């Protein structure tokens, strides 16, 4: 057996590494002695859990002063059995970002997450309940390295968590590759692994008492949300490989055509090199007046919009550059990535982070559902319902505005939703007069204001987004405040609370820090956070009703599902019913839609 020593916070920590089967007796004694609670972690070949060559190399168990490392790569079946038995007898398991490690154990050892989630205490969840702000935005951050720096020591964070970067440099490889290539028994690799559980145990002890009393009921709630999302991650979304490959090839061909034209006619070698593009526009006579902080000519979305508005050859060039850039981004960031990361069963896997933003809003990687073009079906067409299934989408009706009505108690807005009135038209008429109709542009301005107020936007934001004058924008904003005085009062109340305390508390008991210099953001944080909880509570109801195996994506105010074709209409209606919520006097209703085989069919695709 290998024994390593490391000092942390004045304590000498022992890292025990099993080398031979006979060393396992000591490991079993350790598990029996600490079966009430242990920190657990895994070391793997990378982050792509569902790729064909992914494997788990080490599994670690630890307390605040001692850890045991099992080299699974060497122990093979014996090691897997030991891990299974150890996890089975533990009453409580502490992990950092549990969803990842539980999916590793499920994928590599067949230890079902369903059996482990009830035992889990996730330090990342605790950290986000203590302070949801990322490092650099006033918070201490939520990665293990950031938490070590905050609660143990910056030196430990740099020296121990920096070991893998150091090893990558020494072995002349990348940090992404070192995980799979470093010798299994390299002492620094083993130190890194063994100390992870020690750090996690210590961080848990430091964080637990810091969770605000008002937020303590959220601990089991957030663990349940994380659990449900991990099952959605594990299930994956079926990829139409043939269609996706054809689309990737088509876009590559079109991209190469545009790039050839831009090179031959305008001398642009790289469309993503702004200096190349700027040079071409200067040759067409454009004089740059806007520059970046580093002094380079500013070429951004606003610049391209101005060039297109100017017309002529500059507009033609701007459109070609944008098309070439778009094709490159859509192909490499989306379609080719789907093809490259699909598993052996042609499924792509999401990685849902249910507590991402400071408001706890969800984020999704793997399948970037939140960033796909809103009305375009082309990329969504890559994904299919399971055989014999069709796609369904169930989304909330104006979720954030209805939450705003419920929380603010504004009588006019509440009544408007009860009556099914046109809220945007009401705002427009309050600003411009009763002669405004739903077809007038003023309604569009009012719509921007209605949603803008949720996000803390004022007249300047409205003017920027709609192109109207600042005077007209102020008129619409004043119209909103006149139409819904309860919202104005509620916004002022939250701003005062934020100024007084440095935070507000949402209806679920979540503490939301608000910068005292930006107290106008309090309303936005409250609405966004509460809306997120509406969706999350719906996920729990759907899970309890047995729908989780059919869910593919939770996207803010929408759930995407794969449903058996013969029961799809019933299933979509039932999901919609379970998602709907009565928030005080306001019904946050839902709209179910059933499509064809592909996700894109919900956006206009014919399959």
UniProtKB/Swiss-Prot annotation:
GO process terms (BP): DNA-templated DNA replication; double-strand break repair; viral DNA genome replication
GO molecular function: 3'-5' exonuclease activity; DNA binding; DNA-directed DNA polymerase activity
Catalytic activity: DNA(n) + a 2'-deoxyribonucleoside 5'-triphosphate = DNA(n+1) + diphosphate
Residues covered by the 3'-5' exonuclease domain: 1-213
Superkingdom classification of source: Viruses
Family per record: Belongs to the DNA polymerase type-A family.
Function: Replicates viral genomic DNA. This polymerase possesses two enzymatic activities: DNA synthesis (polymerase) and an exonucleolytic activity that degrades single-stranded DNA in the 3'-5' direction.
Entries under PANTHER family matching the protein: DNA POLYMERASE I (PTHR10133), DNA POLYMERASE NU (PTHR10133:SF27)
Name by which UniProt lists this protein: DNA polymerase
The species this protein was found in: Mycobacterium phage D29 (Mycobacteriophage D29)
């Amino acid at each position: 057996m290998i024994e390593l020593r490391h000092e942390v916070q004045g304590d000498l920590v022992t890292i025990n590494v099993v080398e031979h089967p006979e060393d396992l007796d000591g490991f079993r004694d350790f598990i029996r002695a600490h079966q009430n609670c242990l920190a657990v972690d895994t070391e793997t070949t990378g982050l792509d859990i569902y790729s064909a060559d992914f494997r788990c190399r080490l599994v670690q168990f630890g307390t605040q002063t001692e850890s045991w490392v099992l080299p699974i790569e060497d122990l093979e079946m014996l090691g897997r059995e030991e891990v299974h038995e150890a996890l089975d007898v533990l009453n409580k398991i502490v992990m950092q970002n549990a969803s990842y490690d539980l999916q590793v154990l499920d994928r590599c050892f067949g230890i079902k997450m369903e059996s482990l989630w009830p035992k889990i205490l996730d330090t990342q969840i605790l950290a986000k309940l203590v302070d949801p702000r990322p490092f650099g935005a006033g918070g201490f951050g939520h990665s293990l390295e950031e938490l070590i720096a905050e609660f143990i020591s910056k030196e430990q964070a740099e020296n121990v968590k920096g070991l893998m970067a150091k090893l990558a440099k020494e072995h002349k490889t990348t940090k992404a590759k070192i995980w799979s290539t470093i010798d299994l028994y390299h002492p620094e690799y083993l130190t890194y692994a063994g100390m992870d559980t020690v750090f996690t145990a210590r961080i848990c002890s430091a964080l637990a008492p810091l969770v605000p009393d008002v937020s303590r009921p959220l601990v089991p709630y957030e663990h349940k949300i994380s659990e449900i999302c991990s099952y959605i991650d594990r299930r994956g979304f079926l990829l139409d490989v043939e269609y996706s490959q054809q689309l990737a090839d088509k876009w590559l061909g079109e991209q190469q055509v545009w790039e050839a034209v831009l090179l031959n006619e305008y001398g642009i070698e790289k469309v993503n090199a702004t200096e190349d593009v700027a040079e071409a526009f200067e040759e067409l006579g454009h004089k740059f007046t806007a520059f970046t902080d580093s002094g380079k000519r500013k070429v951004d979305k606003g610049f391209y919009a101005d060039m297109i508005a100017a017309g002529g050859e500059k507009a033609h060039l701007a459109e070609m550059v944008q098309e070439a850039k778009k094709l490159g981004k859509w192909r490499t960031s989306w379609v080719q990535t789907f093809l490259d990361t699909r598993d052996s069963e042609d499924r792509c896997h999401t990685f849902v982070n249910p507590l991402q933003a400071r408001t706890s809003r969800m984020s999704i990687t793997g399948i970037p559902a939140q960033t796909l073009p809103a009305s375009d079906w082309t990329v969504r067409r890559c994904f299919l319902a399971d055989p014999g299934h069709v796609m369904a989408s169930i989304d909330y009706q104006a979720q954030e505005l209805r939450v705003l009505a419920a929380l603010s108690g504004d009588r006019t807005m509440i009544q408007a939703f009860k009556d099914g009135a046109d809220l945007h038209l009401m705002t427009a008429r309050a600003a411009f007069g009763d002669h405004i109709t739903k077809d007038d542009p003023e309604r569009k301005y009012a719509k921007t204001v209605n949603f803008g107020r949720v996000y803390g936007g004022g007249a300047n934001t409205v003017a920027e987004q709609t192109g109207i004058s600042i005077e007209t924008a102020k008129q619409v904003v004043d119209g909103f405040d006149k139409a819904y005085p309860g919202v104005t009062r509620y916004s002022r109340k939250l701003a005062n609370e934020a100024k007084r305390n440095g935070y507000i508390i949402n209806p679920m008991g979540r503490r939301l820090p608000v910068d005292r210099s930006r107290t106008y953001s309090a309303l936005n944080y409250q609405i966004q956070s509460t809306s997120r909880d509406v969706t999350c509570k719906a996920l729990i109801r759907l899970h309890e009703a047995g729908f989780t195996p059919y869910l593919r994506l939770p996207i803010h105010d929408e759930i995407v599902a794969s449903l058996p074709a013969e029961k799809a209409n019933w299933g979509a209606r039932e999901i919609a019913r379970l998602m709907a919520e009565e928030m005080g006097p306001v019904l946050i209703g839902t709209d179910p839609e059933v499509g064809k085989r592909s996700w894109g069919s919900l956006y206009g695709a014919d399959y």
